[in-house]
Amino acid sequence: MLEGGKTMRIGVIGTGQIAHDNVRALLKTGRVEIAALCNRTREKAEAFADEYSLQVPVYTDYREMLACERLDAALINTPHGQHCRQFLDCCEAGLSIMVEKPLATSSADGLRMLRAAREAGVRAAVCHTQRYLAPMMALRAFLSGEEGRALGRLRHVSDTINLNYFHDQRPAWFFDPAQAGGGLLMTHGAHQIDRMHFLIGQPTDTLYAHLELMTAYSGLDGGYQLMGRCGEVTYLAQCAGYYLPQESALELTFERGSIRFSWKDNGVDRVGVWLGDGGQAYASLPCPFDMENTYVYQFDAMLDALEGKKNDAPTLEQATEVLLVLEAIRQSSDSGMAARVGTIPVD
């Protein structure tokens, strides 16, 4: 709710695949009104409205929607390469903004967006959804308690994502470097870097990386291997997008134990969190959160951010730090040497 008990009116920019998860979750929060929809193809926006019983105006030009509708906020669900321009126009319109990850396809654009939001005095948050996976929520809850603190200092993180990425059900824009900004590194590297930064509590300062470029898809990578450092904590991350079972797992090594995390059932791993404390086996930790509500948890946090309440939603600064890491990964892979990660200038 906004001041005076007013419900936040949201204009949705883009009604593609991810918009379904996002709008379904926003409606489930009971905290917003979807006030308008925009898609370049009118029929797709109209079909989207019908699916969710939304009796709202439909536009094919988001700028017209911003000018004609009395909105409080915008939700940007478009291909990565379109985020920056749309975000800047929403800032100019004075709207709060929720934008899909990655924030942009370059740190230069991320910094433009950050400065524009500051200058316009608007609030914004980024959909780095994996912070709100049920096992991640359980992991965070455990680490904030007495047992979690007893593990001592975090020393190392290992993070693996594998999946069959290059299939014909994936929207075509993912295979256009101008729209997607890259391959696995942009789509899943953004997830990995954000969740590791979030758990470690500070951004990457130095890294060494290798990108696997795809001959069949010019300008796209099919995976990467990465070693990084966040202050005194180190990490290893790897991702492959070949014909593989899906895997998404983390292991956090502390001074007095470790924690394993997985959010995919694949015949080897299963969804959950496990504690290893020096014994011969891992013990499963309770997970009172629901995987089906991942996006609801995310949007509750993001709406708190837009309403000026205490929250843990991904910020523009954090999302820009992710972009700086992705660029350093490319630099390291190209040079064959370690790379320092850029920082956000202090204005």
Where is each model-derived feature located?
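Hydrophobic residues in well-ordered beta-strands that form the structural core
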Residues: T60, V99, A124-V126, F261
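N-terminal Rossmann-like dinucleotide-binding module
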Residues: L2-Y52, L303
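C-terminal helix-rich "cap/oligomerization" subdomain common to oxidoreductases
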Residues: M1-G4, A73-I76, A301-D347
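Beta-loop-alpha module in the N-terminal Rossmann-like domain of NAD(P)-dependent dehydrogenases
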Residues: V56-A116
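Predominantly a Rossmann-like dinucleotide-binding segment in NAD(P)-dependent oxidoreductases
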Residues: Q130-H210, M214-A216, G336
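Rossmann-fold dehydrogenase core element
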Residues: R112-Q130, R153-V157
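Contiguous beta-strand/loop segments that form the cofactor/metal-binding neighborhood of enzyme cores
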Residues: T187, I193-G267, V296-K310, I344-D347
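Active-site loop of classical SDR/Rossmann-like NAD(P)-dependent oxidoreductases
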Residues: R40, P286-D300
